[in-house]
Each structure stands twice: as C-alpha cells, then as structure tokens.
Swiss-Prot record:
FAD binds at residues 11-16. This is tRNA uridine 5-carboxymethylaminomethyl modification enzyme MnmG. InterPro entries: FAD/NAD-bd_sf, GIDA_C_N, MnmG, MnmG-rel, MnmG-rel_CS, MnmG_C, MnmG_C_subdom, MnmG_C_subdom_sf. Keywords: Cytoplasm, FAD, Flavoprotein, NAD, tRNA processing. Transmembrane segments: none annotated. Homodimer. Heterotetramer of two MnmE and two MnmG subunits.
Amino acid sequence: MVKESDILVVGGGHAGIEASLIAAKMGARVHLITMLIDTIGLASCNPAIGGLGKGHLTKEVDVLGGAMGIITDHSGLQYRVLNASKGPAVRGTRAQIDMDTYRILARNLVLNTPNLSVSQEMTESLILENDEVVGVTTNINNTYRAKKVIITTGTFLKGVVHIGEHQNQNGRFGENASNSLALNLRELGFKVDRLKTGTCPRVAGNSIDFEGLEEHFGDTNPPYFSYKTKDFNPTQLSCFITYTNPITHQIIRDNFHRAPLFSGQIEGIGPRYCPSIEDKINRFSEKERHQLFLEPQTIHKSEYYINGLSTSLPLDVQEKVIHSIKGLENALITRYGYAIEYDFIQPTELTHTLETKKIKGLYLAGQINGTTGYEEAAAQGLMAGINAVLALKNQAPFILKRNEAYIGVLIDDLITKGTNEPYRMFTSRAEYRLLLREDNTLFRLGEHAYRLGLMEEDFYKELKKDKQEIQDNLKRLKEYILTPSKEVLKRLDELDENPINDKVDGVSLLARDSFNAEKMRSFFSFLAPLNERVLEQIKIECKYNIYIEKQHENIAKMDSMLKVSIPKGFVFKGIPGLSLEAVEKLEKFRPKSLFEASEISGITPANLDVLHLYIHLRKNS
C-alpha cells in the first residue's frame, strides 16, 4: 500500500515528537512512523527534564512552539532551580517527572494534533530518486512517500543491550533494534560510528528503608518551563539521598572482569559526564563514596530510579551492589540497569538545518546525531521539523546563531566539530552565556517564534512592549546621575542601603545585590508601574552590565570579521595555528569569505581568528 504526506517522521521519541508536532502546527501534512505507539514520549532513562544547560534548551523549545516544556509542567513531581546561588547565566531549571503522565500526555497530544497521523510499524529503508529522499518502506510492506523525511531513531539503530555477559539486539530493553534501516544508512555511504549509553536500576518504593536518608525537597516557589503555564502550584514529592560505600566499591572491583565495559564486549564510547558506577569506581579509586539520588518515577511512588548508579554489571552483582547501600538493604529490583550500544551518524554529514549533505530532503535529529539527553533531542527535532516545512514552502531556512540560543550552540558544535562521544549540553559550551540566560528566553526568541507563526499575536504585542520598556528604562537609568547629596543619602538609608561616596548612575546602583524589586520601585518612581518580568530583566542587565556590553562588542567584532573576503588564490598551507584538517578543507572548498569558511565542518572560531590575522598581514605586506 502506498500512502502520501508532506513530511515523514521516523521514531516517536523526544526528537520525533517535536519534529512531527511543529511541522503539523506549521501546516504540513505529517505522518509519524513508530514501532510502538504506547512508548511515544517514554523517558527511557532518568525521570527528569531540564538541568544545567538542558533547562535552557527546554525553555527555548517552548518559546519556539515546542511541547516539552508544557508537558513537563503538567507532569512534574518536583521542581528546582539548580545553581540558584550563582549568577543567572548558569542557573538551570530541572523537574522530576511522572514518567507515566508525561508519556500519556505526549502520546495523546501527538494522536490528537490536526495534520498529523501515526502508524505502528518499523521503517526498513529509504526510497531515493536522483539523490533525493522521496519516502520509506516498512516491515509490513507499506510504502510511504513524502517530500521530506526526518529520522529520529534514538538508540534503535543496530542497538545492542548489555547486561553482564548477556547481549540482546534491542533498541531499548525488551524492544526490537532497527537493523534493516541501520544497514540501509551504512549502504548509502554515511559515516557511521558506535556510541554507548546506559541506565540505572529501579527498585520497588515499598522495599526502601527511608529512615536515616537525607530528604531532598523541591523549591518553595517552584519554577516552571512554559511561558504558557498559568496558576502553577504543583504537588511536589521528595527525593532521597544515599551513598555508595567501601563495601559497594569492593563488590564492583571484584567483578570488573565481568563488566562489559572492561571486558571488551562494549566498543562504543559512553557519555563522559554520566559514567557508569563501575567506571566511576575505576577512574576515581581514591573516593570512598559516591552520591546517589532515589527519585520517584510516578506520583504513586511505586518505583524509584537510583540516579548515579548506571551500570551494565551482571544481575547477581547488581543485587549485591544495591543491597550494600544504606536504605536499599532489602530493596526489590524491578528493573535492572543495562548499557546499550547503537549506531550514530557523524553530524558533520549535516548542514545547519539538520538536512544531510548527501541526500536532499533527509533530516536527522536526536541521538542519531551523537547527542545524549531528552532536551538535546527535542531541540534538534524541533529545528528539523521547522526547516523541513520552510524548505517545502521554498522559504529561507531557520538557523539560530551561537549568540542567540543554546540550540544554536548545540547544532553548530555538532556540524562543525562532530563528536566521538555522546554530546550533552552545558552552560560552559556557550561563549555568550550571559546573553543566553533562561530568564530572557522569550525576549531572545519571541520575534523568531512570531515570524514563524508559532506565537499568538496578542502575546507577542505584550512581549514587544515589555522589550521596549526594558530598553527605554535601561537608557534612562544610564543617564540618571546620582550624587551623594543629603536627600539621596537619606533615601538610601531609609531603604537600608549603604551610602554612595561618589557620583554614580542608576545602573551602578541597581547592580547591588541588595537592591530588590521593591527597592527599585521605591527609589526610582518611573520603575514603579513596570511588571515583574520587565523589572527582572532590568535588574539582571544592570548587575552584569559591563560583561554584557563586552559580549555584545565581541559579537559585533565577530560579525565584522565574518564579512572579510579571502583573496583569490590565498594559500592556506603553512599558516601557523591551522591544523592539517583545516588546511585540507579550506583548500578543497576555497571559501570566498570568512563567513563561508565558518560554514565548513571542522573549521573552528580559533581557525577563523588565525585566518583573519594572516589575511590582514598579507594584505599589509
């Protein structure tokens, strides 16, 4: 049977959900093919959304019309701001989720969205015509034709699950791997490598002894992800903290020879920042304990996820390890930990739109691109979906710059640098992180969302008004000069503020930590009518004014540099600081400007700085 649509999405994980929903929202006829409809939106690993860098991605996805944020707000069990004591640039919202509720909400949203149909089957191969994808075939002899195809297969491509010496061909425990599609992609000439990730055991909630464990509460004023969320007052559950101990470590050491990670059974590289417990014991042998979080998987507290205990050790060893830990002495394991090895395609095979360079109309998103994490997958799925629709409409692609969004950093890192280990987002990856805060996501991306038809006009008008008020009042504060007069000192004293000794502007005064919203309104009457969202932005911009201005200067410098032309016949060979790889690519593609050079996979900002310097030197000589 042959069926037709505008866009096909293969895979119903977090990337596939966002890709299919956003494409349908933008008016395309979308068909989602997934192995199991019941697992659409399943959180395969930890029951949480957000975190450092990841919270930024979730909020960016939300502003650009995605679903992850709003689903999390309706399924959360505990909400916290991580790094709350640090500056706003590195804070991250994180929520424990009810995995069942999240999955059901995601699945129902997909099944009830106009322009979007779903079928339960396995994609086996791509249909190509003149190096352009025109559809797929499935395991039940269905043929689907479409103008664009987005592949979001997660860990299913040639997936192998490892528990001790045992191996099974699964894309997730108990689910079939996608071997035919994996073979098809290899035959098409894509650069395919292997990665590994893992998950932690789960234990029955009623078998845990919580007495004496440290209780971990959510925030009193819980943060939320979606700007559409109203009247947020969730019921929050506690998590609990326990630790491994020397006995735990000895059990693991005694069984290193049975660990797939060390026996040579696993070849794929695992996530650097989420190592298995056996890897931690091996690498950090001097540590006497490692912290573990017991996280409820649902509101019913029937199962707890042991965060920090990712493992692929044999079943009997997992039992001994868990029973050696305080509070888990009599714990009943409901699901064992395991490692999974899978194919991914080097993301240097992609353009900034996530379309493959090799096959026109084919987009890749999520773990197939070498990333790890629900949020990274959702961000890629969203961008692939948006760009597939824009390509259908013959409109300009939507590409976010590194100074606009963490999504821009994520995609640029992937396609220019590639990866040899599972890539996850951190605030440290963003050189302009002071400009890319969670708190200003709406102001950064609202205009893009509105232009793409992904934000309501009334809300956008409010947002535009707020943005103007921020700019106007920051200008006014910079021009508002205060002297240590008797009147000014009296007013500061009334607010319990330290006096000023010299002339200062309003921005400098508001840079004080102690100058809260109430004091801002009291001291500067023109700020009194402003809403909390506007005041928050003014406060942050004042506090980090010097650093923010410096980052804007760096952006202007970079933009100016990218406009520099590369002289015809310019010799790249022999320039100190350029790697052999960079020279080979520059000689091959012969870019006409530094901007064109920046679009070449593997050419880094450091390469561009070196090129800029030598173009200048050779012009002068």
